[in-house]
């Protein structure tokens, strides 16, 4: 019985030791657009834990955030992104046209899909004096819309197209 426990203990320690020898430290850079900062902080932490449990590798994901267009330009100009999560397919296409990613990136998933979600926030004055509650509220008399520069912000491009 003691021999059996000794053998099992030796095998277990060998497995743990071997796994730690082969485990890698992996650093990745996710270049993304501004509103995703908090999302990716949480997602990256969860993914790192998952990956370490699955493989034993320790993953550190660094983040770079800015306007989608500016981030695309940074990648085109040489920032070494491992992951690119931008607001518009247009920005990803610009990176692909410069040879930084596969030009056929859109065909990677079924139906040329790029699964993603985004949250829209209405920022109003204290007390919401104009009672902005939904999209229809935005066409009320006296309501003004402020949006970022569509030349550098993917969200602003969507705003421009929706107007």
Predicted segments — roles?
Residues 18-20:
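N-terminal signal peptide c-region/cleavage motif recognized by signal peptidases
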Residues 157-163:
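Extracytoplasmic/periplasmic substrate-binding proteins
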Residues 6, 14-15:
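Alpha-helical hydrophobic membrane-insertion segments
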Residues 1-9:
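Bacterial N-terminal signal peptides that target proteins for export
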Residues 9-10, 60:
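Intrinsically disordered, low-complexity, compositionally biased regions/tails
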Residues 24-153:
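N-terminal segment of the mature folded domain
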Residues 11-12, 90:
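Short, linear, compositionally biased motifs with a strong N-terminal bias
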């Amino acid at each position: 019985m003691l021999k059996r426990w000794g053998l099992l203990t030796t095998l277990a320690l060998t497995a743990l030791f071997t796994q730690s020898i082969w485990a890698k430290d992996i650093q990745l850079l996710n270049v993304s657009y501004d509103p995703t900062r908090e999302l990716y902080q949480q997602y990256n932490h969860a993914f790192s834990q998952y990956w370490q449990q699955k493989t034993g590798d320790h993953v550190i994901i660094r983040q770079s955030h800015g306007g989608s267009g500016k981030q695309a330009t940074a990648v085109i100009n040489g920032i070494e992104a491992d992951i690119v999560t931008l607001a518009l397919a247009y920005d990803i296409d610009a990176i692909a046209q410069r040879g930084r990613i596969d030009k056929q990136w859109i065909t990677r998933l079924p139906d040329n899909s790029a699964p993603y979600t985004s949250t829209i926030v209405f920022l109003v004055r204290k007390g919401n004096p104009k009672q902005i509650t939904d999209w229809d509220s935005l066409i009320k008399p006296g309501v003004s819309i402020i949006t970022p520069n569509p030349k550098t912000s993917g969200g602003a491009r969507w705003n421009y197209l929706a107007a």
